[in-house]
Amino acid sequence: MPVRVIVDSSACLPTHVAEDLDITVINLHVMNNGEERSTSGLSSLELAASYARQLERGGDDGVLALHISKELSSTWSAAVTAAAVFDDDSVRVVDTSSLGMAVGAAAMAAARMAKDGASLQECYDIAVDTLKRSETWIYLHRIDEIWKSGRISTATAMVSTALATRPIMRFNGGRMEIAAKTRTQSKAFAKLVELAQIRADGEPVFIAIGQNEAREAAKQLEELLRNALPEGSSFMSVDIDPTLAVHSGPGAVSVSAVFANQAPELSTGKAGAK
């Protein structure tokens, strides 16, 4: 049996894609307290049970686990604890430093290799390589939810509210940072297209556009990206997972991209030699 690939629901993988590639998706937790909602990561017990089930299916080939950034959730540390239960490194946990379809794309790449008979190490390597070539941006229609979750400071939230700005966030080293501040959705989308176009550097791109209660806006952004990016680029539409939607709020639109090459700041001699 091939290597088994596991993600949590923050990867935003569409159900049909996960089923086609035989990727196991474990749901993160959303808790409702009246009008307030919060999220929690997976426990080591939950993860160990899931890994054990997949090891039974895959035999000696092992399990590759990709989870939300350790900077954003306790899930990664729980995964490392759960993996240590099993002998001989049969469960490998990828330190993704990301979320959304950047993680989803890495899982897809690993699962395709697994279907072709690749080893656990080979699946791990392609997942890491895919993540190094990826970027994730998210346009926030409003900042209330992300401020409440502690992902941005009170000062930043106050300035954004006072100036009526709609930020574009970027994931860097597993943490969220502001990539750009815009006044309107149309300007934000133009900026997102510019960021993706510059980073693509004339090479085809894999793009996954996520949305939370913003389906028409996501379609508009996809059309802009299709017109701007090189021929041969591929596109996928996904829903932002409910656990991420708690923090991004309604109207959020995300862009996860996998590029042909690593960004200059991520390039190393080892990567270039592969």
From Swiss-Prot:
Residues 3-259 form the DegV domain. InterPro entries: DegV, DegV_C, DegV_domain_contain. Pfam families: DegV. It comes from the Bacteria. Hexadecanoate binds at T39, S73. One of its GO terms (molecular function) is lipid binding. Disulfide bonds: none annotated. Keywords: Lipid-binding. The keyword tRNA-binding does not apply. Transmembrane segments: none annotated. Binds long-chain fatty acids, such as palmitate, and may play a role in lipid transport or fatty acid metabolism. Monomer. This is DegV domain-containing protein Cgl2349/cg2579. It comes from Corynebacterium glutamicum (strain ATCC 13032 / DSM 20300 / JCM 1318 / BCRC 11384 / CCUG 27702 / LMG 3730 / NBRC 12168 / NCIMB 10025 / NRRL B-2784 / 534).
